């Protein structure tokens, strides 16, 4: 067999088995404090328009709610299809603290740290917390419910009020926009145009590359992508609640300030 053909066949077999080797890298820096082995935590604040104490959620067919009950959340996962084999390797959450949007992120750098991440995230939810997401009812919440079940932990998301912004966005603009993805909503409503953004579809590869000894660069880009998702969730919510964020102001406030 010609050497070239042998190498091609070997490469194909590696890809099928998911054993593709990744060159080792010196760039292994994942930001944040290590809460426990393999679990990193970051906290940052973003200047943003302060919501009123009570938010009119009629646009989502929900009762008015206090802004300090809101927890915007978003996950980055090992696959986009869901299912029991898919896990979240990053959970981001944002809430209002002292007139600013606090952004917290949990990232696991080993599979063994997943249970610690799930426990930590559960501790961020109070009895009256209202969840805010974008397609979270169909994707993020069911995925996390599965992971809590497999970890034999109570599911802290079960039975909570959940404002999924995708549904009111679709009702209002599905006939006007090319699609109702969050990137489209943030551009149309907030004037946010992302630069050097890592698409969510590339997040699984970024994490797996890091696990195999590769560079952390794209994993840091995943964290930046997740943080912008959280800021946009808050901005879209305020817009739809009748507090349209001026486009120039929104663009000026896309910078996240780390504490």
Question: Model regions: which residues?
Answer:
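Short, function-defining helix-loop hinge/capping sites that tune catalysis or transport
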Residues: 82-84, 143, 172, 237
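Acidic, Mg2+-coordinating catalytic module of metal-dependent nucleases/exonucleases
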Residues: 182-253
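Conserved DEDDh/DEDDy metal-dependent 3′-5′ exonuclease domain
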Residues: 101-188
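Conserved RNase H-like, two-metal-ion catalytic cores of nucleic-acid enzymes
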Residues: 59-127
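Acidic, low-complexity intrinsically disordered tails
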Residues: 254-259
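N-terminal accessory regions of nucleic-acid-interacting proteins
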Residues: 1-67
